[in-house]
Amino acid sequence: MSKINFLPTLQDAYEPLMAAQIDILREQVVAEGGDKASVQSRFNYAWGLIKSESVDDQRLGVKILTDIYKESYQRRRECLYYLTVGCYKLKEYSMAKRYVDTLHEAEPNNKQVIALKEMVEDKIQTETIKGLAMVTGAIVGIASIAGYYMRRRK
């Protein structure tokens, strides 16, 4: 049986908490000593920040989770999942892939991990195709302009 099968979906990350809810999570962390607060309080706050619509909040959430990952061996798998979601939301797809690949190695049969991995890989593929289309379009545009000027010179 998989160790983590109770995780939120990627779509959950796009349902922001109300400002008052984030304030409560922040106040809990501050009351417990900020960086010295319990792992659970900081984790909850980080997830609340990742769910935020503010990119700065999302980045702070990812940073907090990264710190938790480094210091709490017991929470590493969970952190990897949430870090994947956070990086995906920040459009840092290569980092998201790195995290989800590491998690997938540890839990190759976890359906939530597999689904998240597929979403990350699909997004990377889509972004790659968009990038290639833009480069191709730029080349065609430049070639057209060059051809136009070459014809005018004659």
Swiss-Prot record:
Keywords per UniProt: Membrane, Mitochondrion, Mitochondrion outer membrane, Transmembrane, Transmembrane helix
Topological type in the membrane: Single-pass membrane protein
Gene3D superfamilies assigned to the protein according to its UniProt record, in alphabetical order: Tetratricopeptide repeat domain (1.25.40.10)
Comment on protein domains: The C-terminus is required for mitochondrial localization, while the N-terminus is necessary for mitochondrial fission.
Single GO biological process annotation from the record: mitochondrial fission
Segments forming a coiled coil: none
Localization in the cell: Mitochondrion outer membrane
Stretches assigned to the Cytoplasmic side: 1-130
Ranges per topology, Mitochondrial intermembrane: 151-154
Protein name from the UniProt record: Mitochondrial fission 1 protein
Family statement: Belongs to the FIS1 family.
Transmembrane segments: 131-150
Record gene name: FIS1
Any GO CC annotation of this UniProt entry: peroxisomal membrane
Task of the protein: Has a role in mitochondrial fission. Has a role in outer membrane fission but not matrix separation.
Main localization category: mitochondrion
Pfam entry (one): Fis1_TPR_C
